Amino acid sequence: MHDAHYHYSKEINTLQNEYGISGICNVANEKEFELVQQKHLFYSCGVHPWNASLDTLNSMFPLLKNAPIIGEIGMDSVWCDVDLKIQKEVFEKQLQLAQALNKPV
């Protein structure tokens, strides 16, 4: 079984090991990046719409550049308080980066 998108926790790690589940761990910050590197997990990296800002995007640029997959990215007009214009700009920049580096989203 494969989980296409999860966020790391000890509980999830235990279940994955117990049931032989593999997956793509979503990284949203440097601390999570260090964790997936230590655990040798396959991962994606992206600025989630809830955290969308140019500052966040700039701080995550090195992680995005080195990630095998760009994600979890997008836009959220229902559950998110971040202005849609900002979300759109951050989303588009991540798509442009993925295209320039030939990475899947």
Question: Can you annotate each of these PLM segments?
Answer:
Residues 1-105:
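Mid-domain alpha/beta scaffold segments of enzyme catalytic cores
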